[in-house]
């Protein structure tokens, strides 16, 4: 018996009956030989962790555009916090941690530079619109490994594309990630907003903090405990905690996410993304080689969207400067 088979047997003995079992996966788009050590979802987790798009998350905005300081969240730190919360819940409910972690780590791979401001900019430019969760799926299916994709399992791909809104994931692990994503971003965005000076913690709705707690740690713990207490046969959450959490999220949308400073910077994002988009549509051959090939194989608009959405904040700004800002001449 190889290590993978033994691990799958341990899953049968330890996971809850409504968990997603590795040996019952619906499979991959392209059949592969099984790994002798790792079950399929662990293998997916590893592929995501080692891919280029995952590394780029470290220089992609979470909420505040190009923040200075070492303590602000990036898209990468957000992803890691989502993974931690989701795995905590999965372990407590005896669900599949490997699947939970794979979805968590992959859920934002398609995010644009400059956070949701960049997403909105590309959404306006791209025919058919742009949604980061659909782009995340395109990244793992098509763009990684020079067009081969990561060939992830159906369950991970389903969790990626359903992590934010609309229809819920088909697996309980995917549904956990969706909840963990919201728990993570609302709470760490509060912390970052306070640090940035755009939010006074005393203004947080008292009816929300009375239920959820005064601190980030307390609020996260409250939500986790509520999920654990109301999940039996499926993932759920208590009505009181959920109502308070949604009200707190609405408060953040009404205050921090529409802060005048953030909105002023968003206009600059529109310009950077818009100018780069039009430039590369007219100069397809100046993109990286892979995207040039993609433009001729697929279509230029799709390739330009892929190229820009994959940029980090820093790379997008540097590229904009290289293309549109005159270079200095040193005259002796």
Annotate each predicted stretch with a short phrase:
Residues 1-79, 83-89, 96-97, 118, ...:
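Histidine-centered, transition-metal-coordinating active-site segments
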Residues 101-106, 179-180:
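Short alpha-helix carrying the canonical HExxH Zn2+-binding catalytic motif
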Residues 110-114, 184:
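Short active-site segment of divalent metal-dependent hydrolases/proteases
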Residues 115-127:
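A glycine- and small-aliphatic-rich helix-loop capping segment at beta-alpha/alpha-beta transitions
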